[in-house]
Amino acid sequence: MASAQVPFSFPLAHFLIFVFVTSTIIHLQQRIVKLQTLSEKELQAVQMSSPNAARTDMQQSAKLQGIFTINSIGRLGNQMGEYATLFALARMNGRLAFIPESMHNALAPIFRISLPVLHSDTARRIPWQNYHLNDWMEERYRHIPGQYVRFTGYPCSWTFYHHLRPEILKEFTLHDHVREEAQAFLRGLRVNGSQPSTFVGVHVRRGDYVHVMPKVWKGVVADRGYLEKALDRFRARYSSPVFVVTSNGMAWCRENINTSLGDVVFAGNGIEGSPAKDFALLTQCNHTIMTIGTFGIWAAYLAGGDTIYLANYTLPDSPFLKIFKPAAAFLPEWMGIPADLSPLLKH
């Protein structure tokens, strides 16, 4: 005889739905409570895995001193400066360092960065103390007070992190596929039929700087004369170099850089929104010619070798000099070629 099925009663269905909804709400409430604050146990667990933690006296004494983070603003060069500054100041002050999601999204596709990410939902629950940084290291930055400190500003100076250069270079190691694509391009270059042994990356910053420098900062961008001098210095120093030009103003470069010697290649795509290709090409060269801007500064810093940069590119009364110190931006061993300021003096 076939077994009779007991019909599913309507009141029982309501009861089961009530139990399911109630348990779900309780579960979600418990999760929300758990996420309200960063507990000491959670921070200690993160501390054990943080790159900065293992090297501080704070961890050795089992003291929990809070965390540092930094604003994530600007394009690639700015983001790199902010990351490296956070890395160095956290180490210096015995704190944990966390980067915002937006910084991770900007840097992680290109570099093998290691600092942990502070997700936006968690960051919003932390009572941050904003701490403004100038664009150069100061003694007071060695003793920064506060448990939860968020740095603001546009720090990008070797004075913050140069003492950690090997570690900074490791943080900004290119992913294999990014590096290999750049190296494959360089291997295919020829100078008058021969494979060059010396590669000089050239970064020409234009874009908004063409208007911002003279109108806002009483300054100039690199002109044709500067680039001719810079290229000639490398030609005099090295045998048959090849110059790999990248820029966000490639049309201007093609019109103003002399290619008659057959040793200049216009290689970059000049797209500011996807700078990985241009940056990788520059870092894989032996030497660097830069103009102005943090993109070129970081390319030169990672490439090593000889660097020539545009010097004295503002008038002495420029407001830019209140927020920018050339000696803190360019390494002492780099070589500066003074800019031609005559266009500014005509106005």
UniProtKB/Swiss-Prot annotation:
One cellular component (GO) term of this entry: Golgi cisterna membrane
Single GO molecular function: alpha-(1,2)-fucosyltransferase activity
Sequence ranges on the Lumenal membrane side: 27-347
Expressed in which tissues: Expressed in stomach, colon, ovary and uterus, specifically in luminal uterine epithelium. Expressed in various tissues including heart, liver, kidney, testis, epididymis, small intestine,and cecum. Expressed in duodenum, jejunum and ileum.
Transmembrane segments: 6-26
Induction section of the entry: Induced after microbes administration in the intestinal epithelia, particularly in the duodenal and jejunal epithelia. Down-regulated by androgen in the caput epididymis.
Pathway listed: Protein modification; protein glycosylation
A Gene Ontology biological process term: oligosaccharide biosynthetic process
Entry superkingdom: Eukaryota
Purpose of the protein: Catalyzes the transfer of L-fucose, from a guanosine diphosphate-beta-L-fucose, to the terminal galactose on both O- and N-linked glycans chains of cell surface glycoproteins and glycolipids and the resulting epitope regulates several processes such as cell-cell interaction including host-microbe interaction, cell surface expression and cell proliferation. Preferentially fucosylates gangliosides GA1 and GM1 in the antrum, cecum and colon and in the female reproductive organs.
Misc. comment: In mouse, there are three genes (Fut1, Fut2 and Sec1) which encode galactoside 2-L-fucosyltransferase.
Entry similarity comment: Belongs to the glycosyltransferase 11 family.
PANTHER family from the UniProt entry: GALACTOSIDE 2-L-FUCOSYLTRANSFERASE (PTHR11927), GALACTOSIDE ALPHA-(1,2)-FUCOSYLTRANSFERASE 2 (PTHR11927:SF2)
Name of the protein in question: Galactoside alpha-(1,2)-fucosyltransferase 2
Name of the encoding gene: Fut2
